[in-house]
């Protein structure tokens, strides 16, 4: 009996010692609660971006977050050496991992974007019908000048005595600056939002913003009204700064006068001047570098007016997810009267998605039922494949991680598509925001324009398009070249770094983008058929070519001296028997004779055949031939006559330079 009691006591001592050592080891081991900030950040990242098949314990091979800091103890009386087994199993696991190549976690980690994780906490907006939103003004917006011209965005119509001055201002600036100068810089505007927008409540923990405005030889009042509207309608706690980038202007009112004027805001508004004309695209990248204070970059054109409560709806999605880029609904400010109206088109609520045709012309298409189903209310943000490019908001660090704009893009054109594709294909989102509205003035006919500087060379916009499709469109680029055949041999510079960016960030294919995001583009703009011939259409053995003269949507084409520069004299005839220029088709006019040019899709105006050996264009539906009058410079169809030289044509390829 004494032996049994002794045995029991010794056994209890051994077991007690073992349990004590286990408790001691546990207290010395690394625990989740004791992680360093770096380890906690890594765990947060893994929670937000879970990886599949980590194994039974949920840990990846090589993950040392729960690695013991002391070896397993050897307990007297327990014959199993736990530490040796642990070392043996670890070596076996390491051997199996290396023998089998990279673990699934290693592979998956390489597929993750290298963008910073979300560190900002923000609650979703809440819709409370009937309860005025917390960012809504409590009182009606005050007028800039009570009873003044243009208040509440009502049209200002000038009399005939101003005609000459108005025309001169339109030629110089693109707008009726005579009327603009009569309107208060602080004028009140109309509210074009859906009524529901007034009842959204936003977490006040919004990110702050730097508003970046690029200008070149802008009119004074349109530029300053842009600045005034931002200051007037943006809560001061969120407006970190307004950064003006002067892209080498030579107007006197944009020099010392501007420097003195912005002192009114005690440093809130800053101006930086480029030492040469950089163009809108690169000037915006410069603006991102000059902006130091805001967490978000908001880009506005130099002739805008932000509307009531524009800020919170625009920045809230970015505050929730830093990889979201937002775009306000863009309203139209008349360049003549300064009335503000909604854009035409879109769905029954006026909402549209950004799109393009295959020649890369900007388009707007109605919001789809698929996108509507993703929202609970019609005033929530919705996905868009592309943006127009002039007005958008993006988290500053995210924009830098994307590489800003392609540094090879020059002056203007294509940058809106480049940033849109980059965002979507590399893991971000592009949202249009119905409750954030900004008015924008569009240039009027008669503006002399701002020609690019000499160092840029010819065809900068077309070169931009080529760079974009070569980097982002993959096999779809063939459809661009079918629509813009003159660009096929256009030199577009080095894109190796851009290709490397796509590879390093594991950006998705354009096919994925077309199927998942831009799925409705081909319904509106079907993939173009191959071209049979393309180039100038020259009268055989003459110096005259068919010229659209810039006319569209029903204008008559004419004969003009051949200039070999493409543009209005560049046509293509495709396998669908369409004779086209960009998104316009040639067809017979209402009189059944003269040839006009009008917008078409791929199911319309399939009515031409080109017989190269006969130098003849035949109008299929009428059986007549393409003819011309070199005296009247008219182009028409007439009864085919093989002896008539005016019915003989040749198509000569033209390459842009």
UniProtKB/Swiss-Prot annotation:
Keywords: Disulfide bond, Glycosyltransferase, Golgi apparatus, Lectin, Manganese, Membrane, Metal-binding, Signal-anchor, Transferase, Transmembrane, Transmembrane helix. GO terms for cellular component: Golgi membrane. It is found in: Golgi apparatus membrane. Substrate binds at residues 247, 277, 412, 443. Its EC number is 2.4.1.41. Its cofactor is Mn(2+). Highly expressed in sublingual gland. Expressed at lower level in stomach, small intestiine and colon. It comes from the Eukaryota. It catalyses: L-seryl-[protein] + UDP-N-acetyl-alpha-D-galactosamine = a 3-O-[N-acetyl-alpha-D-galactosaminyl]-L-seryl-[protein] + UDP + H(+); L-threonyl-[protein] + UDP-N-acetyl-alpha-D-galactosamine = a 3-O-[N-acetyl-alpha-D-galactosaminyl]-L-threonyl-[protein] + UDP + H(+). Residues 30-66, 83-105 are annotated as: Disordered. There are two conserved domains in the glycosyltransferase region: the N-terminal domain (domain A, also called GT1 motif), which is probably involved in manganese coordination and substrate binding and the C-terminal domain (domain B, also called Gal/GalNAc-T motif), which is probably involved in catalytic reaction and UDP-Gal binding. One of its GO terms (molecular function) is polypeptide N-acetylgalactosaminyltransferase activity. This is N-acetylgalactosaminyltransferase 7. Residues 1-6 are cytoplasmic. It comes from Mus musculus (Mouse). The chain crosses the membrane at residues 7-29. Belongs to the glycosyltransferase 2 family. GalNAc-T subfamily. GO terms for biological process: protein O-linked glycosylation. Residues 532-652 form the Ricin B-type lectin domain. Pathway: Protein modification; protein glycosylation. It is a single-pass type II membrane protein. Residues 30-657 are lumenal. Mn(2+) binds at residues 301, 303, 440. Disulfide bonds join 197-435, 426-507, 545-562, 585-600, 625-640.
